Amino acid sequence: KKIIFHPLMLPKAVVLDPELTVGLPAKLTAATGMDALSHNLEALCSPFYHPMAEGIAVEGCRLVGRYLPRATARGDDLEARMQMLVASAMGATAFQKGLGGMHALAHSLGALYDAHHGLLNAILMPYVLKRNQSAIEERICRLARYLDLGDDSFEAFLQWVLDLRRELGIPH
């Protein structure tokens, strides 16, 4: 798989229209939504310094946690679908800070096995988080506080990810 990029390929404007996503099947909604979470999450955990991207990423994670289950369960929920479009756009903005292991593995595995990129990110997410715990724990604990999980620990956030995956039907 090759990534092709050039600044002239960037759009001049982006239109977020939730009505265009209403027919998306639940499994695809879940997988693409988890891809949005992975963009925000990996941007937050990137070791590079970009405080604005971090703030955007944290809010993008919150939006995914709140609205992805709704968008997946009720495909005609325009509010949930709109907020997921916003979370996705936030992730695309935030990942200028960088991505990480989830995407490095998902790109390669997707090319080898013709597997959906978002689904691979969702499957890999808890394992990559756990493997990188020592490097990202402080940021993840801050995110757990922002998400108001009731427990600001890395383990609580990891459980949040596992619970979200289970609710969405993501394989373990």
Give, region by region, the residue ranges found by the protein language model.
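Hydrophobic aliphatic residue packing
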Residues: 14-15, 102, 128, 170
